[in-house]
Amino acid sequence: AKDDLKLNDKTLKSLYSIGFTAAHVMPEKGIFKGKSDLVVLNDEMISVAKDVTELIEFKTTGWSDGGYPNSLLGVIAVIRQTLLDADWYQRSSDIFNKYPEDNEPIALNHSLAELARFKSQRLPFLFMTKEEHAALRALKISEEFSLNPWLLSSGYEYRRLDQIKKQ
């Protein structure tokens, strides 16, 4: 994620002048955006912590983009299927490692392996939620897949605070 951050000197000095010395940097594209880093805001952009969170956003591509998915239902399906695939990948890898002579090796998939690692080590999954209903969706998915959820919220979650507390 650090490599995606492009700040000019003026922006860097402006941030530093108002007290910002570090930033939680995140990739911008996709539903499963990737891993975030904590970086020092200076010329070198040194990573203080790598792979802080795995970032997920309920992001549709829209009809004009020609991409998939272009509906919220499709996004939720992609998130659930990807997490199911990561579970399958972890179980299959464990079985192969335990009984290599009885099984064919599975194809290496770094993305699924990283999702499985984050899940098994209870590392945080940061959900970008643009409204309170997305926060509830994120918590429901987190409960279903035993994730450690963090919410980057919209500020309107107080409208559903009782429901959020229950989850």
What are these regions (language model features)?
Residues 1-13:
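Aromatic/His-enriched, Gly/Pro-containing loop or helix-boundary segments
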Residues 6, 71, 109, 160-161:
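Alpha-helix initiation/capping motif
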Residues 16-149:
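Polyanionic/metal-chelating signatures
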Residues 132-134, 155-159:
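Short acidic loop-to-helix transition motifs that present clustered carboxylates
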Residues 142, 162-167:
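Acidic (Asp/Glu)-rich catalytic clusters
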Residues 150-154:
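Acidic, glycine-rich catalytic loops of TOPRIM or P-loop NTPase phosphate-binding modules used
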